[in-house]
Amino acid sequence: MKKHILSLVMALTLPLNGSGITFNIEHPKKDENGNFIQGRVLLFLSNNNLDEPRFQTNDKSSTAFVFGVDLKSKNSSKTIIDSKAFGYPVKSLDQIPPGEYFIQALLHKYETFNLKTGHTVQLPMDRGEGQRWHSAPGNYYSKVKKISLDPKKRKSIKIFLDQIIPEIVPPSDTKYVKHIKIESRLLSEFWGRPMHLGAHVLLPEGFDDHPEASYPLMIFHGHFPKDFGGFRTSAPDPDLEPDYSERFQLEGYNRIVQEHEYRFYKESTSNEF
């Protein structure tokens, strides 16, 4: 497992380039604000169309193939991915089995950070998606294309990154859940740009009726949650199609989640809580 995860990380981050099967990927030079784009170009190959290839890359045996190269020139609107590009779960395009593939490419944009330490680094800034490069707003990607590939035969394929991931609509405040965003002075000084901390706050029943009251605070540090989870004010959906949780090896896990979320709401707003 550790070996697979390391290979995936290297495919997403290591700079390389190269022939056999060649993908010519065309993308914008500048973003919508007129700035030269820096980042990494990723190519995905999947043997099925159950989902877009960019969403099928993971550390499981069923993962799609992914190959990556860095953008090396600000003046170029083309990137080549060939047999020299580092990949996962195989190292090279030369190692993929011949067959039919659904292909897609994506440009993961980087920002330049002038650190307080004096160093300058290029990194992908989170844009509200929780460091999920396949869904980061502002990233360019292509439509899915089906194609026949054989690494033993020379072939050149053009891909156009003519789609852009839209901005994420922030969650709305409700009676019980509020969302706050605070600019951090220390983080902003270190990174050389405004950096913010966010929080989703679950309020107790009767909070608005007692503005003078003080309440105990419990903090849970999640992993980039987009909203407060585990809490719903509506009853579980009786028509929800049960799914299978591979992680817990459990059928109907989504139904169980909704039941517990609603139970938490009912219990936490009751007079006995």
Name these PLM-found stretches:
Residues 20-22, 38-42, 100, 198:
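Exposed beta-strand and adjacent loop surfaces of beta-rich binding modules
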Residues 47-49, 55-273:
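Non-catalytic cap/lid and distal C-terminal segments of serine-dependent acyl enzymes
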Residues 1-4:
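Positively charged n-region of N-terminal signal peptides that target proteins for export
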Residues 24-25, 44, 220:
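Short, hydrophobic/glycine-enriched beta-strand segments
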Residues 33-48:
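Short, ordered, surface-exposed loop/turn motifs in non-cytosolic proteins
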Residues 21-29:
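A short, amphipathic beta-strand motif
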Residues 9-18:
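Hydrophobic h-region of N-terminal signal peptides that target proteins for export
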